[in-house]
Regions:
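Rhodanese-like catalytic fold shared by cysteine-dependent sulfurtransferases
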Residues: 1-34, 42-83, 92-127
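Short, surface-exposed ligand- or partner-binding patches at beta-edge/loop junctions that are enriched
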Residues: 87
Length: 127
């Protein structure tokens, strides 16, 4: 049995996806050019706070929420014409999530290098 490590999975994902800096993400949010999606679990939001204006879709249900054939598809809540920018606590889960959504057919999608940890030391407002 050949089981890949999480480190290998993330490395492979990072070679296939778009990663942006916190500063790039902030400019896109400020200019209303994207959907900012927080994929952390609810307890992480409760413990650390939320980024103002970010939509929350937990990693565990992300693909279901973004499947147009799903009964819980985020119809009307996210602008499908704008880039989707995902973040988690540090960038690992969001990298894997972006890879998964690319495989579903999403094209305008990226994740934030450093995730919430990096965002909390930036111009983003935590509420």
């Amino acid at each position: 049995m050949n089981i890949k490590s999480i480190q290998n999975l993330v490395y492979e994902a990072m070679n296939e996806i778009k990663t942006i800096t916190v500063e790039q993400a902030y400019e896109k949010v400020k200019d209303n050019e994207c959907n900012l999606i927080d994929i952390r679990e609810i307890n992480e939001l409760d413990n650390s706070g939320r980024i103002e204006g970010a939509s929350h879709i937990p990693r565990g249900t992300l693909e279901v929420h973004l499947d147009p054939n799903s009964s819980i598809f985020q119809k009307g809540q996210l602008d499908q014409n704008k880039e989707f920018i995902l973040f988690c606590a540090g960038g690992v889960r969001s990298a894997l999530a972006v890879k998964s959504l690319k495989e579903m057919g999403y094209e305008k999608i990226s994740h934030i290098d450093g995730g919430f940890a990096a965002m909390s030391n930036s111009s983003f407002k935590i509420v």
